[in-house]
Structure formats: structure tokens, C-alpha cells
Amino acid sequence: MPDSPDHVLDLPPTQVRLMPERAVFEPASGTLFVADVHLGKAAVFRARGIPVPHGTSGETLDRLAAAVARCGATRLVVLGDFLHAKESQSASTMAALAAWRDAHPDLACGVVEGNHDRHAGQVQEAFGFRTLDGPWVSDTLRGVHDPAEASVPGRWTLAGHVHPVVRLRGRHDSLRVPCFWLRGRVLTLPAFGAFTGGFEPSLGDADQVYVVGDRVSPLPRQTPR
């Protein structure tokens, strides 16, 4: 795909596309993976008296709709932290989620339970999202929330939880950007949500990161990090 903004990554016996929408798509199964959506996080902050912008959940759902449409996914798997907290269940957030689901009635949706989901409750089930209390498993991939749960010899695993970012350094300044982080057979996705922080993991010599911008690009290993 020479003109595609995606980066094609071989994970034998399958192949996935790392998308600048901060998602992973497996064409063979039609499955789109995202992690750490954190819907309603801004509403939680406002409920606790912290002034933050409105509209971040709507922006996140718009990007999710665009990702589904661009790749033609038939299944969506959220790798944990779909909602941020119980206070995320504001009327505006729930209305936005209901409208999003109404626009995608044929999309099979599942959520691998993350640490925030356990506190937020399983409200997503009312919108047709199946909650999984263990890893999501197919013939080719495993999906978990925390990379620490990922050790299964010989299996490729997709994970979230970390919100990986990488620092790109210029001569006079630097910039932190979201990235996909591959260590061994574990691919950790960047946080999908519009209102999320990031963590710079300590990268090993064999690790590979894929920088997210207008397109997804591998960061040369010899580049100082």
C-alpha cells in the first residue's frame, strides 16, 4: 500500500496494519483493535471541580467512526479502559455513545476489561458491547489490557494500558508523540482517547517503535531516544 498512511506489520501467520488513528487492523479477520478510549474522562474531571474542555468524548467517537469506515472493520475489540470512571456516565457521554452505536448496528463490539472498566461498571453492555473478563483470543492473536498479562510463548499479543509515547529530539527542542511499541511478541497500542496522558517506556535494544503522525512510521533503531 504505497499511498497508505498505515504501516503494514507482519505477525506470522497474520499481518496487521498500524493506523494513524492509533488503531490496529487485521484485514484477514476484519477486526479493528483500539486501547484506552477513556470515554467520559473530561466529564470526570469537571465533576471533581477541574475545568477541562468539553467535547473530547465526541471527538474520540468521531475518530473511532472514521477508523471503522476507513478499514471496513466488521468487528471492534477494545483492549481495556473503554470508560474512565463511574462519573463518566454523564448524559452527554451516554447520548454520544448511543448515537455512535446506532450508526454501527452491524459492528460486533467487545471490551477486554481494564482497570478503569472495573471501577466504571459495565454500562457499555447496554450499548451492545460484550464485556470480556479475560484475554480476547483468536487463531492468530491475543488481546489483553495490561502487557504484563501477555506472556504466552509463541503467540502475538496486542495490549494497551501503558499509553506509550516516544520523544523525538531535534537540535534545539523535542516533542513527545504517541507510538506503537513492539517488544518481543507484544505490541502495545497508543491510547486512543483524545484526553489521555502518555508514558515514555524504557526501550530495549531489540524494541521497535512506530511513530504516529499523519502516517505511521518506524523509528530507526539507531536514532537517539
Model-predicted segments: where are they?
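Extended recognition/assembly regions associated with phosphoester-bond processing machinery
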Residues: 1-79, 84-225
